[in-house]
Swiss-Prot record:
The lineage of its organism: Bacteria, Pseudomonadati, Chlorobiota, Chlorobiia, Chlorobiales. GO terms for molecular function: arginine binding; DNA binding; DNA-binding transcription factor activity. This is Arginine repressor. HAMAP family: Arg_repressor. InterPro entries: Arg_repress, Arg_repress_C, Arg_repress_C_sf, Arg_repress_DNA-bd, WH-like_DNA-bd_sf, WH_DNA-bd_sf.
Length: 149
């Protein structure tokens, strides 16, 4: 099952229904044709920032943070990047010490079809593009989303 599609459905269900918890959401997902294990749903909640809030009547309701939070996160991640360089096969992002994992994770969560994945060390992220023919455009895309010159 496609993670992005699953998370899109989770967002839709949580935003459009009064969902009180994970078990209720698991049932709703099942009715929509998504077979999801509880640990997977927990990871999705963490990645998406879904929280459980108390309602006025004393119950609980799941909620998804607004999208502008993504813009704030993008700005913060961008401040951790020192440089972005590329050769004919890969892209390297140099970060502040200890920040490479966060930058790599941010890029992975974007789910861009142009990026196969990232490998992060302490202060360096290796970006693996979907094709080496588009290295320049992938580098430009990363610079744009991280607001780098």
């Amino acid at each position: 099952m496609n993670k992005a599609l699953r998370q899109k459905k989770i967002r839709e269900l949580v935003e459009n229904n009064d969902v009180s918890g994970q078990q209720e959401l698991l049932g709703m997902l099942e009715k929509e044709g998504f077979s999801v294990a509880q640990p997977t749903l927990s990871r999705d909640f963490a990645e998406m920032g879904i929280v459980r809030n108390r309602t006025a009547d004393g119950g609980y309701r799941l909620s998804v943070p607004e999208e502008p939070q993504e813009d704030i996160l993008r700005g913060l991640v961008g401040m951790e990047v020192l440089s972005i360089t590329a050769n004919e096969t890969s892209i390297i992002i140099n970060t502040l010490p200890g920040r490479a994992h966060g930058v790599g994770s941010f890029l992975d969560r974007i789910n861009s079809p142009e990026i196969l994945g990232t490998i992060a060390g302490d202060d360096t992220v290796l970006v693996i593009p979907a094709t080496i023919r588009k290295i320049s455009s992938v580098k430009s895309y990363i610079q744009k989303i991280l607001s780098q010159p």
